[in-house]
Amino acid sequence: MTACKNENVSKKCYLCILLSRMKKYLKDIVKLIIFLALGFFFVWLSLNDLTPEDRSQLWINARNAFSGNGWIFLVLCALIGILSVWLRGRRSVIMLEPMNYHVKSTMAYHSVMIGYLANLAIPRLGEILRCTILQKYEHVPFQKSFGTVVTERVLDVLICGLVFVAAFILESDRLTTIFVENHVADNIVNMLSGVTKYIVIAGLILIIVLIYIFRKWILQFKIVQKIKQVLLGFWEGLISIKNTKHPVRFIVYSLSIWVCYYFMFFVATFAFPELVSTLGVRVALASLSCVVIGTLGFIVAQGGLGAYPLLVSMVLALYGMGAEVGLAVGWVIWAVESAMYLMMGLLSLVVISFTHETTRTETVENHQN
């Protein structure tokens, strides 16, 4: 009788675990479908208003970018992208040092590159996978490395904001057109005007007060305790900035990453002779504007699919370029970057798997001897 009960309990536990995993996978699948649907919507949106002649010219422009000397500039674009990933890896090494975790630069690079590969498939999976790799191969606790990842994201937002401001100062007449014509600012103001604004503020205050009053009771839940541990890991990652042993190098790496993003686009523009000949020296400022606005495309759609080329085309239209040229530039640069992350990410997976297997074999042989 006892054996039957134990068997039933085991079956229930197994069923609960199975349902939990299915729920997680279902959420990931739904999230992926939503982001892909947005991406394909932007693809349709970018091509919908083009005439058959424009679509034909778009394909010709994209194909010509890989002919002649164009492929050299596109390869250089990919190499600069790889450099930006290496810089991210080096920056993460510096951030982990104050916590007494000395990660190899090669492993830091591979973890970041594999993270980019994962993000092509599922949003935000890359950050989790990156920390998991460091935990498995470099014995860095997940919370600690994830805290530094959050810190990196905060820094990236700050630097992106500075670049955004710089771009608007240099090209205010053109870039403000995107927001003015689409009434973005007006819509935001209207949403937070009148009674709605006060309801939102009152709701936030009420939530904060309730959390403070019932804080001791709330902290008794295991899930809250886990969240607390994660947040403590985040905090340690955040304060690691001021404790870094190489502050100058840290700042240089952070700025250099965004310099790489700029030159990835700028160099790739030389694969499009019509763009360079039309804009001349203005291609430098146009590249800055495209990098700033194009970054938004990676936020709204999976891997920037559809959204990135559309935004690049919108920016280049402000410089007098037709949609058949702007979309070709956006799609080619997006394709080159995505292909680079795909190939180098797969290569990094192979390298760390081979390295881990070799290390494990050597360890077993040493124990046997």
Task: Annotate each predicted stretch with a short phrase.
Residues Y109-K136:
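Hydrophobic, aromatic-rich membrane-embedded alpha-helical segments
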Residues A3-M113, I178-T295, M340-N369:
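Predominantly cytoplasmic-facing regulatory/coupling regions of multi-pass membrane proteins
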Residues V300, L310-N369:
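C-terminal transmembrane helix pair
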Residues I80, I114-P123, S289-P309:
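Transmembrane alpha-helix interface/packing and boundary motifs in multi-pass membrane proteins
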Residues S105-M107, E127, V140-T151, G322-V332:
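Membrane-interface alpha-helices at helix entry/exit sites of multi-pass transporters
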Residues L117-I122, K144-I169, V332-M344:
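Membrane-embedded alpha-helical segments of transport systems
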Residues E127-K136, A301-L318:
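Re-entrant/interfacial helical elements at transmembrane boundaries that shape
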Residues F164-E181:
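Transmembrane alpha-helix termini and helix-breaking/packing motifs in multi-pass membrane transporters
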